[in-house]
Amino acid sequence: STVVGKCCKGNFGMSRFLLSNDFQRKLIVSGKESYYDHFSKRSYSSPSKAPGTESTITSTKIKMPNIGSEGFAFSSFLSTVNKNSRMINFSSCLKTPVKPEQIAANPVILKMTTELEKIPRALRWMCGGFPAIALCDAPEPWQLGFQDAATPIMQGIMDLHHDIFFFLVQILVFVLWVLSRALWCFRSKISPIPQRIVHGTTIEILWTILPSIILMFIAIPSFTLLYSMDDVVVDPAITIKAIGHQWYWSYEYSDYNNSDEQSLAFDSYMVPEDDLELGQLRLLEVDNRVVVPAKTHLRVLITSADVLHSWAVPSLGVKCDAVPGRLNQISTFIQREGVYYGQCSEICGTNHAFMPIVVEAVSTKDYGSWVSNQIQ
């Protein structure tokens, strides 16, 4: 509890970054920075450049014990407790320069990695990898929980999940208690002759009424959420049409289509792994993102040009089927700026897994500039 309490006051950027897919690739850094790639067992550093600029990554010679990504993340995660070792939040590395010794030569990490190397990998995941991932605020490998909610709908889904989980835990505890008591009280040593019960009015009434009451408590809170999910904004600020293809997405901003010569439409393909640039995620990055303004009511019209697809973005709490010959629509309200990733969620053929969706929410000013550049 002491470790968790102190770590909650610290930051989890270290663990999140070390477990992210793009950790083994590249990183935007400022000044003479360095980070350790545990997947390739190498440390990387960049030449000095102005803050916020991309830099070419070169290899240096710093080695660490072979403890696996989850062990290294756990050691880094716990090292935030040490006040003398000033660990860095990689999500804000542009503001706080990263020093090589803070990552690879940190005595706390070296000591922990030496000890963690002796622990079985499964135990390292259970004690370190999973807790570190559970506290992340971005999609991660082996993620156990939800992504951060960026819309009221997603927040409502998470709240409903927690409410239902409360009842599920109580049911689980009750069933385990009844099962354990039955196994213990009616074991062969105590009751060598089994009792035969063929009818019980009381228990039949109980197991009919109680589940009905529980289902009511679970269903009633979901009514408001279901209604809000189907609610369509009467006058949305922006309307976007998403068209599914095998195997890419097309987008049309109908509000700016004044003529055939002036329109805002583009195709969005997945970026191949060999073409990924600084900070881009494998199998999730696209060449053309859907750019929308934050804190604005949006409407997305979804259809398909060939087979069934599904337009889904977990952080936004949206998932809508793209059906050929049919136009479905969803409404959303993104509460903060950010980049949100999704994928086609309906099996649509060979390259179904290579149809990512990237929604970038920006400020109204930046959105206006983007639209102007696209139309020109």
UniProtKB/Swiss-Prot annotation:
Gene3D superfamilies registered for this protein in UniProt: 1.10.287.90, Cupredoxins - blue copper proteins
Entry keyword Endoplasmic reticulum: no
Subcellular location: Mitochondrion inner membrane
Mitochondrial intermembrane topology ranges: 226-376
Protein residues bound to Cu cation A2: C344, E346, C348, H352
GO biological process: ATP synthesis coupled electron transport
Family: Belongs to the cytochrome c oxidase subunit 2 family.
NCBIfam families: CoxB
Protein name, as recorded: Cytochrome c oxidase subunit 2, mitochondrial
Gene: COX2
